């Protein structure tokens, strides 16, 4: 299982999902609800559209929207063997492991360290580039 906002898909997202897929037989991705994105600006792309795009990526078996009230609800329902975090995701691994343990979920938490190196491997950088090129028109 992997999670993320996945706003404006870029090569970094693809690398993350490819590496996550290597860790199990099936990759289910939880796409963050707009309401729950707090650590960065709200997504540009609507949540259902982000979910559909993520699900279309060949490494992803299924993409679902997260729960608006309890981020652990889909995890409790799906009971994954592994939860994969990206190199830049804002989760404290120890906190996440402890919260999973409290809920009697025995799943491994793995942080993917592989990072795609490209000029626009960030949704924020893509937005900045668009504004530079077209913002004044």
UniProtKB/Swiss-Prot annotation:
Quick one: which residues bind ATP?
Answer: 5-6, 10-13, 88
Gene Ontology terms for molecular function: ATP binding; FMN adenylyltransferase activity
- Biological pathway: Cofactor biosynthesis; FAD biosynthesis; FAD from FMN: step 1/1
Q: Which SUPFAM superfamilies match?
A: Nucleotidylyl transferase (SSF52374)
Keywords carried by this UniProt record: ATP-binding, FAD, Flavoprotein, FMN, Nucleotide-binding, Nucleotidyltransferase, Transferase
Q: Pfam families, alphabetically?
A: CTP_transf_like
Q: Which BP terms from GO are recorded?
A: FAD biosynthetic process; FMN metabolic process
The membrane-spanning stretches of this chain are: none
| Origin superkingdom | Archaea
Which Enzyme Commission number(s) are listed? Answer: 2.7.7.2
Write down the top EC class of this protein.
Answer: transferase
Q: Which InterPro entries match?
A: Archaeal_FAD_synthase, Cyt_trans-like, FAD_synth_RibL, Rossmann-like_a/b/a_fold
Q: Which cofactor does it need?
A: a divalent metal cation
What is catalysed by this protein? FMN + ATP + H(+) = FAD + diphosphate
What is the stated purpose of this protein? Answer: Catalyzes the transfer of the AMP portion of ATP to flavin mononucleotide (FMN) to produce flavin adenine dinucleotide (FAD) coenzyme.
As for family, the record states: Belongs to the archaeal FAD synthase family.
Q: Which NCBIfam families match?
A: cyt_tran_rel
Its protein name is: FAD synthase
Its source organism is: Archaeoglobus fulgidus (strain ATCC 49558 / DSM 4304 / JCM 9628 / NBRC 100126 / VC-16)
